[in-house]
Amino acid sequence: KNSVYHSKNQVNALPIINLEYNRFYLKGYKPGFIFYKESDFNFSAIVDPIGGYSDFAIRKSQFKDGYKNLESRNTQVMGGIALDFKIDKNIDGHSEVVFGNHGTKVNIKLNRAYKVNDRVTFIPAVTFNYYNSKYMDYYIGIKEKDIQNNSKIEKTYKGKDTIAGGVSATLDMAMTEQTSFLVFGGIDIYDKKIKNSDIVRTNN
């Protein structure tokens, strides 16, 4: 993915495993438990074991020269509530609010599946994310010591509540009844205020 930071672009790989047993499930890499269910929506308790992985987490070794003495922005274990719902027979929605030691994130996603043939499904989606100030301060905040230790950082920055919107597309190719190969691509546009952090590139 293209990094929001002054860093090398990152290659992220994740196993996507979908399992269900009674009210327990694993979707992608997030386990959950459905505690309330109706025909067109359900509520779950969920855990994100690698919160931040898909947006702001980064190892210090990935920063470019002039930023290499920054500390890593690590993933975090987050937990919260998820809502899965149907707007109509074609459009599915997912929303979650998760909390961690380094802040809170809200996600809303709407997608629609188009069956290309018996084995291939095309799934476009739109997303909305909200990150609270604590979350953003951990990932893109800058302290005085960061200025002293990194030649290209000129000012401190305190993270602020931030929103982002995005579009994505997934191509789901069924290999067997139990196994699929997924190709995913997308773009996210962040609130312009994050550009006030010297560690963030200005073209996000």
Kindly give the residue locations of the regions a language model identified.
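Outer-membrane pore/translocation modules
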Residues: 27-111, 115-123, 127, 133-159, ...
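Predominantly the C-terminal beta-signal and adjacent terminal strand-loop region
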Residues: 172-204
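Short glycine/proline- and aromatic-enriched beta-strand/turn motifs that initiate or cap beta-hairpins
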Residues: 1-26, 32, 134
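Outer-membrane beta-barrel "beta-signal"
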Residues: 14-18, 110, 204
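Short, solvent-exposed loop/turn segments at secondary-structure boundaries
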Residues: 4-8, 96, 196-198
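A conserved mid-domain beta-alpha-beta active-site/ligand-binding segment of alpha/beta enzyme cores
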Residues: 149-174, 179, 185
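Residue-level detection of beta-strand scaffold positions
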Residues: 16, 46, 127, 182-184
